[in-house]
Amino acid sequence: MKAVIFIMDGLGDRPNKDGNTPLKEAKTPVMDKMAKDGICGLMNAVDVGVRPGSDTAHLAILGYDPYTTYTGRGPFEACGVGVTVKPGDIAFRCNFSSVNENFIVTDRRAGRIEDTSELEKELDGLKIDDIDIIFKESGGYRAALVLRGPGLSDKISDADPKKEGKRVKEIHPLDNSKEAKKTAEIVNKLLKIAYEKLDKHPVNEERRKQNLPVANMIVPRGVGQVPEIMQFSEKTGLKGACIAGTGLIKGIAKMVGLDVIDVEGCDGTPNSDLMAKACAIVETLKDYDFILVNVKGADEAGHDGNYELKKEIIEKIDEMLDYITKNIDKDEVYIAMSGDHSTPIEEMDHSADPLPILIWGKSVRVDDVEKFDEFSTYKGGLNWIKGTNIMPILMDLMSIAKKYGA
């Protein structure tokens, strides 16, 4: 038996004035058929009432306790874009953002700029005092930053003001150590250098001509050191792979030992080639026991507060699932399908609202649920579970779970 965990990033939502969500209103005949043929429930990736990040959520969904394994998002972002993070390195996730001359943020995602490869070159390889700067774009406005050198600490604050109209925050040490003080000073110097180098860069001059937001600042956050994590194959006995478009999810996969399968045209944006991803899932199942799949677009729409786009992306995912379910053997493959967190249109950010979940495959206890959405699956046989329950349930269905007790 084989298994797929299929995560629709940011899937969940809250009802609008008509009582609908993008998922409830979307035309999803395949998801609904899977719900009818499977076992359903609700799921909180980390815990009830906890607003999870995509990083902590995916760790939990893979069976890892995020409270003991998560040190910050930065190491996963860096790992995901191919940086080999070494002991002592300090890693951050970053946004390219638009700021004015006073560092007031005018667009947190620089107009969702799609190509920042030329801007990356301005920062990667810099040296500030005795610290080497490693900087890699990780798709669109996202990037990873690594500081390498002596006497560093991850006990520092973030630069992200989290809202437009606010100034990029100065980095401060969070303890009294000389290492934290030094690290904060290095990052503050880097932010000034970044603005000087990026503001007049030809890429941004061209964006100004086109009346597009410029990417003239980097905003680091999610600082952390590399955690020690048991490899997925050792933990489960399964040969695992990951198919995802974003650096963060690829980084989590690499950190736990999943092979990352790159798919052309799948970049984690709303324009991602979902049918190419569907084909890759079917092909990858020929060589692997387990696949973690992440489809990002609905989350992007949620963060933008775009109801119609989120609904449209969910309908495209349904078409993707149509291809997958028609080209795999239900008697040989289990699919656990859910989200990693809710990204409600009204919040434009992650929330702790529980997610619909289903498990589809041979010998599941089919319940009475007939539609896959936030309001229907609560009646299902899975009841209300946490993300860390998914892998044990799948392993039990696959008849590879170890018995607890005599």
Curated annotation (Swiss-Prot):
| Pathway connected to this protein | Carbohydrate degradation; glycolysis; pyruvate from D-glyceraldehyde 3-phosphate: step 3/5
Which CDD domains does the entry link to?
iPGM_like
The entry lists its GO molecular-function terms as: metal ion binding; phosphoglycerate mutase activity
- List the Pfam families hit by this protein, alphabetically: Metalloenzyme (PF01676), PhosphMutase (PF10143)
Q: Enumerate the catalysed reactions.
A: (2R)-2-phosphoglycerate = (2R)-3-phosphoglycerate
Tell me its EC number(s), please.
5.4.2.12
Asked whether the keyword Ribonucleoprotein is assigned, the reply is: no
The protein's matches in PANTHER family, at most eight in alphabetical order, are given as:
COFACTOR-INDEPENDENT PHOSPHOGLYCERATE MUTASE, METALLOENZYME DOMAIN-CONTAINING PROTEIN
HAMAP family given in the database record: ApgM_A
What is stated as this protein's family in its record? Answer: Belongs to the BPG-independent phosphoglycerate mutase family. A-PGAM subfamily.
Task of the protein: Catalyzes the interconversion of 2-phosphoglycerate and 3-phosphoglycerate.
- Name of the protein this chain belongs to: 2,3-bisphosphoglycerate-independent phosphoglycerate mutase
- Species: Methanococcus maripaludis (strain C5 / ATCC BAA-1333)
